[in-house]
UniProtKB/Swiss-Prot annotation:
It comes from Pyrococcus furiosus (strain ATCC 43587 / DSM 3638 / JCM 8422 / Vc1). Residues 1-21, 203-239 are annotated as: Disordered. One of its GO terms (cellular component) is cytosolic large ribosomal subunit. Belongs to the universal ribosomal protein uL2 family. Keywords: Ribonucleoprotein, Ribosomal protein, RNA-binding, rRNA-binding. One of its GO terms (molecular function) is rRNA binding. One of the primary rRNA binding proteins. Required for association of the 30S and 50S subunits to form the 70S ribosome, for tRNA binding and peptide bond formation. It has been suggested to have peptidyltransferase activity; this is somewhat controversial. Makes several contacts with the 16S rRNA in the 70S ribosome. NCBIfam families: PRK09612.1. Residues 222-239 have a biased composition (Basic residues). This is Large ribosomal subunit protein uL2. It comes from the Archaea. GO terms for biological process: cytoplasmic translation.
Amino acid sequence: MGKSLIQQRRGKGSPTFKSPSHRFRGAVKYIPLNYTQEKTLRGVVEEIMHDPGRTAPVARVKFENGIEKLIIAPEGLLVGQEIYIGPDAPIAVGNTLPLAKIPEGTYVYNIEGIPGDGGKYVRAGGTYALVVSREPDKVIVQLPSGELKAFNPMCRATIGVVAGGGRLEKPLVKAGKAYYKYKARNKFWPTPRGVKMNAVNHPFGGKEHHPGKPTTTSRRAPPGRKVGHIAARRTGRRK
C-alpha cells in the first residue's frame, strides 16, 4: 500500500503543518465601526514591532477612549506620533478614514472589503493601492496587481505605503537562510519533487527519474492519485 501524499498529510492538520499563531503579535483590525462612524478618534503610537507572521511591521496604538489596537505600520511612522481614525481625520500618512473622504491619487492600504470588517486588501510589506475615482455609490481603487476594483464609499483605508518594502531585493543566497525564513511560520520546507521519491510515496516516484505516465490527471481522481496537471486543457510550451 502506498503512503499518503504531502497534500493528504497537510489536510489532516498535524502539528507539522499548523501555523504557530502563538508566536504572532495578534490580529490587525481597525477599531470597530460604531466607535468611529460619527466621530474621529486620536491615537498615539506606543511601539513598533516585528511580527513573524507578517511581511510588514506592526504598531501598537493607544486611542483616547482607552482602546489599544495593532495596526500595520506605514513607511515613515514614528513612535510617539499621533494618528487619527474617523470621517474627519486629516489626509496624512497613518490616518484612517472612509474611501469617500480620500482624494483621488492618494496611496492607501489595508482597505476594507465590507464596511466594518477591519481591513482585508493590500496588507503585505511594501504594497499600496491608488484611489482612482470617486462616485456617489462607489470608489474605484487600483490594487497592486493593476486590477481596478470598486469599493463601498464607507469602506475604510489607511493613507500611505505599507512599511517593509524592498524585502525581496536582497537574495537569500544560501539554503540556511531559507530554512529560518520558513521555520518562522512553520512552513513545510524543503518540498521534494514527486519524481525524486520512491514509488511507494508518489505516483511519479521510482527509479526511472521521470513520471513514467501522463502527468495530466482527472478532476475526479481519488486523493492519492490527484497529482500533476489537474484537469489541464493543455500542457507544455506554446508553439
